[in-house]
A protein has these predicted regions:
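Generic detector of low-complexity/intrinsically disordered segments
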Residues: 7-8, 14, 703, 712, ...
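Acidic/proline-rich low-complexity IDRs
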Residues: 4-5, 11, 372, 757, ...
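Glycoside hydrolase catalytic-domain context in secreted enzymes
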Residues: 21-729, 738-748, 752, 775-781
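Bacterial Sec-dependent N-terminal signal peptides
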Residues: 1-25
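Short beta-alpha junctions and helix-cap segments that line functional grooves
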Residues: 732-734
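Short beta-strand elements
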Residues: 754-771
Length: 781
């Protein structure tokens, strides 16, 4: 009997051992053992997102495939028998985007609407941005999401790009520095980010089929550089490829972009995923190194299986991609069995959002120190639709399901001001009537497009005499928003509409006749034309799209509670005709909504793919993007890159500029607050290269620093390092980064157009900082 029990026990132990041997567990067994144990279908299940069960992309609601977290953008499949959990990814760049309400519960799941990326870069303060990222990542973790599909570090090539509000700057260094701080802040919570859109996603028109045509130097120096810096400084968990083609090949199918540049040159260790429904060939994406196809389609499953079985796609390549996904999964909270409590500190995060938005606002004009408002200002006449309906952010995946948005009306009231009740009543009655007259959507997909905004109400509807008599001053808000799928129009988005200009001129004329001041607030998604109207108001404050606390932030600055310290992250041209890429960017005036939706579904406008700036876009502006063009070509601008006013004045001491044996430059500058109000200053360092061996801009931003809040009379010495390698330009002929010999002008300036920078000349020796394989050429075989 004892012998029989021993035999039975041995058999049972043996069977258990066989089961365990057949079913290794992720995190317990070596990853290779887990991969070896997977069937072909399981491997495909892992590399294709969770909606791969659907037969068409229309069956999977765009940007809402979350089963584990309702409203999340997508899900990576799990394999239970191998200890692989499903993981969740969700939008977006201004805060987590999930469903705020769920069935069978009264609990809400709102997220903080933080300021958009453009506001973050306008702070020029990486420590502040890190704190925003920390708060944002905290919500990601508390709500059970593993990866936030953000940030986006594409370059603002043209002011009409519909998603510029999601991007950081026209300058690679500023964009990368702020973006890296955001990544590090978010990931400090042990959740992931997805750096996007890799690469050259600089227009929304026909973004899924647009072919970007350009040269490797332009790509590497301007458009890839911010990605490179962020990868090296922050190592985000994931990278998201872009929709567009690059020199004839889909970005998500370019091995030279994803494997050679991203992984081999820059040392990226994480996972690469597609943008939603991006690319044409699943097998080609797998081969290029695009590990995960999102959100997943049934035909991708079929194509990969067929490609493996017929030998077109090797099992070695598939296993490589599976490994990258498994390595990602092992980092996630869900793999580590973190239990989300759905209870983030929303009140604390709102305060973080408020502080960040305030610091990112830019004072463009302040005649005779109209701002901050003097104490005798009590009663305010508030004009403009968006004064009462402030715009927190853009549309599409960059939107956030917030609990509230503080309007300028409420912000002023919170600050103790009285707002004219008759004007308020007129706007509240006007808005629903005007909205009823807006065109009705004809296509259900139009819900994903930027919405229509109602025209400004005529001042004839108001008793302007009473408004002037009963109020101490006037404030006008101009609102402009944008989003995915559509680029902005020149006529009514870059330029102000006739109704908006009439409102500004009418209010200014009426109040100025009575000796009263007028302030304009620009609650806008990006650059707008100002020359034609800016002579009217006494002050102009650029609030951007500041998130849910916007009205409070504006009021803080108007009242002098906070001193504006934001600086422009892009140039504001006098006219759109001055933009260097104007001839090589879509004209949204001619694009129809049905065409836009067709393009998203993979149906290009051009029947032969030959419509300029729609089917293909040539980057003929080269490296002369933004201020690099305006300053080099001496083109006048309305407001230069790096510009911003303050309520105080700062004086700079003589810079101390040194160079070590390796050619690295160090700049020390002492900044003194010479005014009467506490404030922060942004010190900007530009460098002019000799430009003998290669055509170069006259100045390029090579470093910056922001002071702490300096009290009147207080000084601070800031240090700015410029590594030798950061002086290099890309030589296409030899495929190398090289520094030319000669004299370099190191200029400490207040903005890119500063005519009297504090200049020091440093002599550098020639050198090659890196030699790389030729990539991103126009013909890819």
């Amino acid at each position: 009997m004892i012998k029989q029990l021993l035999v039975s026990s041995c058999v049972l132990f043996s069977a258990t051992f066989v089961v365990q041997a057949q079913n290794p567990k992720l995190g317990v067994s070596p990853i290779q053992d887990v991969i070896n144990a997977m069937t072909l279908d399981e491997k495909i299940q892992l590399v294709v997102g969770s909606t791969g069960k659907y037969e068409s992309q229309m069956e999977a609601t765009i940007g809402n495939q979350g089963q584990l977290v309702q409203g999340a953008a997508g899900q990576v499949n799990g394999i239970e028998r191998l200890g692989i959990p499903a993981t969740v990814v969700a939008d977006g760049p201004a805060g987590l985007r999930i469903d705020p309400k769920r069935k069978n519960t009264d609990k809400t799941f709102y997220c903080t609407h933080f300021p958009v990326a453009t506001v973050m870069s306008s702070t020029w303060n990486k420590d502040l941005v890190y704190s925003v990222g920390t708060s944002m990542g905290d919500e990601v973790k508390h709500y059970g999401v593993d990866v936030l599909l953000a940030p986006a570090t594409n370059i603002m090539r043209n002011p009409l790009c519909g998603r510029n509000f999601e991007y950081y700057s026209e300058d690679p260094l500023l964009a990368a520095t702020i973006c890296a701080a955001m990544v590090n802040g978010i990931e400090s919570n042990d959740v992931g980010t997805s750096l996007k859109h890799f690469a050259l996603n600089n227009q929304e028109t026909n973004r899924t089929r647009n072919n970007v045509i350009g040269n490797p130097r332009t790509f590497r120096e301007i458009y890839l550089k911010p990605f490179e810096i962020v990868i090296k400084e922050a190592q985000p968990w994931t990278v998201m490829t872009s929709y567009n083609l690059i020199n004839g090949t889909m970005s998500s199918e370019r091995c030279d972009l994803i494997t050679e540049i991203l992984r081999h040159e820059w040392g990226f260790k994480g996972m690469v995923m597609t943008d939603w429904f991006g690319g044409l060939s699943a097998a080609a994406q797998m081969e290029a190194g695009n590990d995960l196809l999102m959100p997943g389609k049934a035909d991708q499953v079929k194509e990969i299986r067929k490609a493996v079985l017929n030998g077109r796609l090797s099992m070695e390549i598939l296993d490589r991609n599976v490994r990258h996904i498994l390595e990602y999964i092992m980092q996630t909270p869900r793999f580590k069995q973190y239990v989300a409590d759905n209870n983030p500190d929303l009140k604390g995060h709102a305060l973080v959002a408020r502080n960040a938005a305030t610091e990112g606002m830019v004072l463009l004009k302040n005649n005779k120190n109209v701002l901050p408002l003097v104490q005798k200002i009590k009663n305010i006449a508030l004009f403009g639709n968006t004064s009462y309906d402030f715009i927190a952010g853009g549309t599409g995946s960059g939107n956030v399901n917030h609990a509230y948005v503080v309007s300028l009306l409420d912000g002023l009231k919170n600050a103790g001001y009285q707002v004219d009740g008759d004007i308020y009543k007129a706007y509240i009655e006007y808005a629903p009537k005007a909205k009823a007259n807006l065109p009705k959507p004809k296509n259900p997909l139009e819900a994903f497009l930027p919405g229509h905004f109602i025209p400004e109400m005529s001042l004839a509807e108001l008793n302007m005499s009473a408004a002037v008599k009963n109020n101490d001053m006037a404030i006008i808000t101009i609102g402009k928003s944008s989003g995915e799928f559509l680029d902005r129009k020149i006529s009514d988005s870059f330029n102000l509409t006739k109704e908006e200009k009439d409102m500004i001129s009418g209010v200014c004329n009426a109040f100025h006749k009575a000796g009263k001041k007028v302030v304009v607030i620009l609650n806008v998604c990006g650059v707008v034309e100002t020359k034609s109207w800016i002579g009217g108001p006494d002050a102009v404050l650029l609030s951007w799209l500041p998130g849910q606390e916007g009205g409070n932030c504006v009021a803080d600055i108007l009242a002098g509670k906070e001193n504006p310290s934001g600086r422009l992250p892009m140039t504001w041209p006098v006219s759109y005709n001055d933009v260097p890429s104007k001839a090589d960017f879509p004209n949204p005036e001619t694009v129809k909504v049905d065409d836009v939706l067709g393009m998203f579904m993979g149906k290009g406008i051009g029947s032969k793919g030959n419509v300029k700036n729609v089917d293909y876009t040539e980057y003929n502006d080269g490296v002369y993007v933004g201020y690099r063009y305006y300053q080099t070509k001496n083109v006048p601008v309305s407001f230069p890159f790096g510009y911003g006013m303050s309520y105080t004045t700062f004086k700079y001491g003589k810079p101390v500029v040194t160079k070590d044996a390796q050619g690295n430059i160090k700049v020390l500058v002492t900044v003194k607050n010479a005014g009467k109000v506490a404030g922060k200053e942004v010190v900007q360092v530009y460098v002019a290269a000799p430009g003998k061996d290669m055509d170069k801009p006259t100045r390029e931003l090579r470093g910056f620093a922001k002071t702490k809040k300096l009290q009147p009379g207080e000084s601070e010495t800031v240090t700015i390092d410029i590594p030798y390698k950061n002086l290099a330009s890309f030589n296409e002929v030899d495929s190398q980064w090289q520094v030319e010999a000669g004299d370099y002008k190191v200029m400490v300036a207040k903005n890119a157009a500063d005519r009297k920078p504090l200049t020091t000349v440093i002599t550098e020796e020639a050198g090659v900082t890196e030699k790389v394989r030729p990539c991103l050429l126009k013909e890819v075989k």
